Amino acid sequence: MVAAAGTLKAPQVLERRRITIADPQLPGSKQPYHTAAELPFSQAEISVRKALESSRALAVDAILASVECLRSQGHEVVGCGLLLGSGRPLPELPAILASHPLLHTAEGQMFRDVLSWAARECNLPVTAVPEKQLSAASLSAIDSLGKAIGPPWTQDQKFATVVALAALALA
């Protein structure tokens, strides 16, 4: 999670943190579809639903904590940016469970959906940006921030910053 201010030409990173949206105490929560694929279908549906509900609760808690931290520093939180994957529609659960590549796709989609849902629960508008729409120029524009804020300055943080600035521009 990256909180940003400013613009792409004058960006500022206010906060960055890893948030946990898969409960390590809940078996299978990190890869719920992989876990479900090993179960009879009736149990698989329940397993995926439990992981989803748990992840939603964790995401709301993480977003609320971030918002509170930013507000305590005098910042107004006006929205949430979310990086999207390929956007290909998923089939029904039985087809997902029968295809190993779809297990990965479904898990990525589930966690993005969880974050989007949680942001809306926290009354934050969500700006979704497909990864393929991120330009090399926009990523290059924020590359130098890494020196100012220190390591780590990973690709996922760079992507999150560009998407956060896009959400801010639309707020």
Spell out what each predicted region is.
Residues 2-171:
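Phosphate- and other anionic-substrate recognition elements at nucleic-acid/protein interfaces
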